[in-house]
Amino acid sequence: MKIILSPAKKMIVDTDNLAPVELPVYIDKTAEVLNWMKSKSKEELKAIWKCNDKIAEQNFNRLENMDLYNRLTPAVLAYEGIAFQYMAPSVFEIQQFEYLQKHLRILSAFYGILKPMDGVTPYRLEMQAKVGIGDAKNLYEYWGELLYRSVIDDSRIIINLASKEYSKCIEKYLTPQDRYITIVFCELSGDKLVTKGTYAKMARGEMVRFIAENNIENPVEIQKFDRLGYSFRSDLSSDSEYVFERKIK
């Protein structure tokens, strides 16, 4: 069983705590992406990044001095977005790190796919960015089937906790033999169940923690998730979609 998760824009360098275990599997392709980005002007990159001048300047300077092989941070500690804050890997015990290293995969526009303990450096790049490298018209084409092939294992079970922007990288290549379960977090708004971005990100991180703490190998066990006010809605769920509703007090 593999769990897929989106990355986060906000990243840090932390070389004082855990050391990375290895380099990302597609580091050579990452080097190609880096070279392509370095060939662009500051204005071109600002358009790709869709950010203000200050953030563009910070990331342009990062690119100029980027080293893919030294001063690296384990991926699961490098990302600082909401999902990763609620996952709270900095307080994991060794058994949880070992579980995640085996089961969690972080999808990345820059690195392709990451194990939690792969060494990374801060970058800014989203999968839907207008980036054409070689014959590939965009990053979905650039990474192609590689990410799916890296995620699928003998169980053929994938738990999707990624956003649509990233899960698309996997869904295109699914086969009838695969069991792909998308997790939906929602709450009642008026008379409709809706997904609210911030709460969904919180829940994704919390669910990764729940799965790791309970050493889950069978997807059915995920239905027991009951944190942050969420509970499983069996009446709205199916074999390919688990729906969790947050009760608002």
What are these regions (language model features)?
Residues 2-6, 157-160:
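Short hydrophobic beta-strand segments
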Residues 88-239, 243-249:
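Internal, well-folded beta-alpha domain core
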Residues 4-91:
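Active-site helix-to-loop segments that bind/position phosphate- or nucleotide-bearing substrates
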